[in-house]
From Swiss-Prot:
Enzyme class: transferase
Cellular component GO terms, alphabetical: cytosol
A GO molecular function held by the record: ATP binding
Residues reported to bind ATP: 15-23
HAMAP family the record matches: Cytidyl_kinase_type1 (MF_00238)
Protein name as catalogued: Cytidylate kinase
EC number, as in UniProt: 2.7.4.25
Organism: Coxiella burnetii (strain RSA 493 / Nine Mile phase I)
């Protein structure tokens, strides 16, 4: 990068599971033709590797070795295309979407050793024309200099129902009470962890999506994008 050139602009969307951040991040990146960082994919890929190589959460030394050698690849990072995720040559695009992988990813992501290992990898997604990043600590830790930050939240029952419907639509038979219990446990873990807890950045736009449609949330976010003049740089290279 030219020393005089400003870093690529970043829009961050943080929030708990089921708040709608992933759906809106996809739509915004697709609209602007920017890169996308779905940080949850990275943690799920690490969880898959832990299960595949039989490295338990309690094995700090083994986990450190795994994080140093494992090769995670995310292809098609420009929106409009579905990402293909591989780990050490294995296509894990579908495997990481299982509830088991998600549960392990949630627990692994609470470990400082894991979050520190993926920090630079996440920052490397920052490329022109721009990046939309969604996760739990995108605006607070990974990209504190983001030009526009959002924090989505919603009632836990509504978030659980959204997740339940998503899994049902994918043909996965689950119970709503189990989904809500798991979601609330993840919330507790994400909010109380010692490193990068889930919370809004001080300068974030906070949106409660409980009673809002996807289109309403998308329109609200795009209004802020236009107000910052970011839509005007959508086609910059």
């Amino acid at each position: 990068m030219n020393a005089r050139q400003k870093p690529a602009p970043v829009i961050t969307i943080d929030g708990p599971s089921g708040s709608g951040k992933g759906t809106i991040a996809f739509r915004i990146a697709q609209t602007l033709n920017w890169y996308l960082l779905d940080s949850g994919i990275i943690y799920r890929a690490i969880a898959w590797a832990m299960a595949h190589y039989k490295v338990p959460l309690e094995d700090s030394a083994g986990l450190a070795r795994l994080l140093k050698r494992v090769q995670i690849s995310i292809e098609n990072r420009i929106l409009g295309k579905k990402a293909k995720i591989s780990c050490d040559g294995h296509d894990i695009t579908l495997a990481i979407r299982s509830e088991e992988c998600g549960a392990l990813a949630s627990r692994a992501s609470a470990l400082p050793i894991v979050r520190e290992a993926v920090l630079q990898y996440q920052r490397d997604f920052r490329q022109r024309p721009g990046l939309v990043a969604d996760g739990r600590d995108m605006g607070t830790v990974v990209f504190p200099d983001a030009v526009l930050k959002f924090y989505f939240d919603a009632d836990s029952q509504q978030r659980a129902y959204r997740r339940y419907k998503e899994l049902q639509d994918r043909g996965i038979n689950v119970s709503l009470p189990d989904i809500q219990e798991d979601l609330e446990e993840r919330d507790r873990r994400d909010i109380t962890r010692s490193i990068s807890p889930t919370k809004p950045a001080e300068d974030a736009v906070i949106i409660d999506t409980t009673h809002l449609s996807i289109e309403a949330v998308f329109a609200t976010v795009m209004n802020h994008v236009r107000q910052r003049g970011l839509a005007n740089v959508a086609n910059e290279k």
